[in-house]
Amino acid sequence: LKEYTDLSPKLMREITKVKVTMVGLPVEAGDKYPGQLSGGMRKRAGLARALALDPAIVFLDEPTAGLDPIGAANFDQLIRSLQQSLGLTVVMVTHDLDSLIAICDRIAVLIDKKIVVDTMAELLKIDHPWIQEYFRGPRARAAFGN
């Protein structure tokens, strides 16, 4: 906020409190350094920072990387909830199929040097070896409950 706005310190502090609590952190987490936070708390603090300027679009790069399955599922739910309540567009790079299923309405994949964007249901209809292996292979079965 300091770098991109001319808001008063008091107003910046209030915005920080709102964003920190919005992502499920206690207010006092806003006063801590990253090294003083757990991995999951750091992810949430980063998300609060990304939301500080009220963007319409949020870009996330492997948002659940390094989180345990419970923490990853909770973070997925948080992203989906914020996406819906704030009307956010979330552009996400991930290899986590559980996150894809939990968060994404549309998915983009690179196939034969072409980008294909569609819903998961439509992507699964594509008769392409990579699509079938990636979304129906052994690692995908757990995510899809197959």
Annotate each PLM feature.
Residues P9-E28:
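Conserved ABC ATPase "signature" region
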